[in-house]
Amino acid sequence: MALPLPPASNLHSILLVTKSRSLGPRLVFHYPPLSPSAAALAGAKDPAWYRHDVSTASIGSGSSDSEWDSSTATDDDNDVEIGSRTSGGRGSGRTLTGASFRDRDRSKLGTEVWNKQETIDEDDPDDEDGDRNGRNRRRGGDYDWDTVLGFKTDALEKMLSPGKEFNKRRFELGVESIVFVGAPMFVREDGLWKKLKRRKKKRSDKEKLDDADFVKNLTISEEDEEADTVDEIPVKSKPEPFVYPEGFEPGYGHGSISSGPSGAPSEAGSDARSNSTSQDNNPDMNMFNVVFVLNPPALEYQQRVKEMYDNVTRKYAKALKYEEARFQYVWKESKRIIDLKQRAKESNESLTSTWRKIISTSPLAKSIAIMFDAISHDKIAHIHFDATFNTSFQIPQADSTPYLPTALEPQMPGLWLTTSNVVLADDESPMTQHAALLLLEDTETLIKDLGGEVTGNAAAIAFYIRNIIPTKSLLKISKRHNISAHDMEYIASHLVYWRRARLIAPLSPRDTYIVSPNADFSLLPSAVTAYAQRFPTLPTLPKVLNMLSGTPRPFRNFIPTTEHREAYMDILAWLMRGGWVTQLRTFAWVRVTPEIKAKVAAEMEREERIKKAEEARKELLSDNESVAESLLSDKRSSLLSAGTVRSSTPLRMAHRDRGTGGLGEEDMHHSTILSPRITASAAPSYRGSPTRASSDAGSTSSQRTTIALSSSQRPDSPSRLGVRDVKPHRPSPLHLHPTSPSRGSAVSLASPTATSPPPSPKDFKPSIVYSPQKATSLEARWLEKIGQSFEDVGNIIPTPNPSPPKGQDGGMFGITGKELREAWPILLKHLDGRHAIEDVAPRENMKRKRVAAMYNTIKERGWLVVVRHW
């Protein structure tokens, strides 16, 4: 799991660049009005991770930075006068609440920022009032109209106006220590900023036949566009799809529920757009680029740039393109801003005063100012483009971390410390529906931010929020109040994304909670005051934290009576909301004991012996079959030779007839094969002896008939081979059941069954199976053997109380070996050290007490290694 980066946008400025046929590339607007140079930014690194003001607050929402920070002034309703001074803000201009640059950045960057700009602009030949403007620049650079970020304005205009190949692509330009990130938007070839969605007309068959070129009819000409304008008026022009869910685009408190961008504003936009496009199909402006200037650390460069582009730059550019397609919003506002700047420059007005006029006059400039103040403070920006369309932007932040802060890897103090897997993306069964939703704001405050209950959607969402409690899972709440589970998950994901809630395991008095090691105790004084106002009759915050700092115990041990349970659970929810406490969770791995390993080893040895014996038996049968085939071949050769060579001698023919006349076919078969061997063993002979005339064929056809064989080496006859199960020809020493008594006794001393003792547990050491789902073949056999040993678990484990009372911990809880064996495969999925045992019950739809009893039983047998952490 990657270490989550602390929230730090590293945003220093926002620039708006347009390109038109009449004016060419122009730097229309930049915010803040006074920006330090790139060289000054390179030497002024801000430890953004050490900030304490990052919260769920947002610019324009009117919410405070934290629940207990009563001293922090709330944001003004006026979007122009927003953005309070914070200790962790970036080096950029303050919102126009004053006439000077941000005091903190002025003291940090010093006068060398403006001295660099002064030296650049002193030689400007176009400055008619050089001496006067030079004196003004020495006063603070408030009259420097031709320099932005230490660069000449005309140079920036050319650099930030890319070609059309960058249309809808990320524009990234690094200069010195800063990077320009933008999403250029270009006009279409047909002069439109957005493709029209024509409504198909029903044509008669005659019109279809008159159409000679079908492809030509698919092209929208100017005449067709004007004719279809009337038909397009009832059709609502929908914006390009945003990532935010429908109905939630603007965020809270900005008409997100009562009005949406797909309603009436689309109709008005269609009128304005159709009028403009009908008059001039080629608009003057053909490109605009909103550029965000960043100065990220070198090791965080890729991630910071990607976060800014994906979440803010690209989405903001798409929103502006949508407004431009409706009624040329960007170009009209750009011409207004350029006109105001030109007049102020001619009258020698300061930048701050001019920017104040521009922001109060132009909605586009105001939206850029709000965007900068919110994103640079790591808050949510609520942007009002006009009276009919508004939306919200933010860089999502991590709501928790599994790691403790170190000197080399610092974390934001107060961040929720947990390894809870309720939001694991790679989990097969996510915990969303089984998790509880902890609201980070009061219920009524959150509902008020929704803008009231003026519509059905707002009323429904207000009903959902009022019924959300941190002690019940989303699944239980949906069942109790007859709410769709999909709707509950949808609302939960939305609240979590916009920093209004957090997914946690349902709070329970049976769980254990400890003081978080990542708690920010610098906020303790203000937290004590807020806690006392909320819980005046209950123990103080220091006392509660002191109780939870001792030996970990279930939270129910701190509740004095049943009547205090609800109040103490509210205290626990308040502490979880502020990151003061975290849940102590239980994780386990399977421990394989030496006894289990010895049993598995004995089984594997026995299986190996059986396997070898089976292989030997198959090899023996194969050899016997080959011997039989060889003997049958010898017999055929003998008969064939006897019939051809001796047929000319009547005496031999008669003798052969007499010898075989009283025998059956099978007896003749046996006697013919055995006769050469009997002759060879009965008396000594030599090659060419007359007494062996009848066996010459056998001698020449087989080498076996000329060698005297002992009784132990003599092969069996084919008749005996047919009864192989009764008397095998050559029993293997590895055979389990030797049929020959004499040989069986002879080889029994060398048999492994007699000499190899069974494996002893002393020969093995215990080990841990770290991932049962990815276990090896040997580990799988160990796990299977553990499951088989559950049969006698009730007889082996003694329990002091065979029938413990309901709710008592320990003992068997009535768990039988059969139940354990059936539940063993289910429990194994959670014994990998990553899934908490507390999550098994909701995930597998099991009773919590039964799960605890099973784990206690397995733990008593020594088959678990248990650890507890957050």
Curated annotation (Swiss-Prot):
BP GO annotations: cellular response to amino acid starvation; meiotic cell cycle; negative regulation of TORC1 signaling; positive regulation of autophagy
Pfam families the record matches: HTH_NPRL3, NPR3
Cellular-component GO terms for this entry: GATOR1 complex
InterPro entries, per database record: HTH_NPRL3, Npr3
Top-level taxonomic group: Eukaryota
Annotated keywords: Meiosis, Signal
Listed Polar residues bias regions: 273-283, 691-716
Low complexity biased stretches: 56-73, 255-272, 733-754
Residue span of region Disordered: 56-139, 253-283, 642-768
Ranges of Acidic residues composition bias in the record: 120-130
The keyword ATP-binding appears for this protein: no
Function: Mediates inactivation of the TORC1 complex in response to amino acid starvation. Required for meiotic nuclear division.
Family of the protein in this entry: Belongs to the NPR3 family.
Protein name listed in UniProt: Nitrogen permease regulator 3
Organism, scientific name: Phaeosphaeria nodorum (strain SN15 / ATCC MYA-4574 / FGSC 10173)
Gene that encodes the chain: NPR3
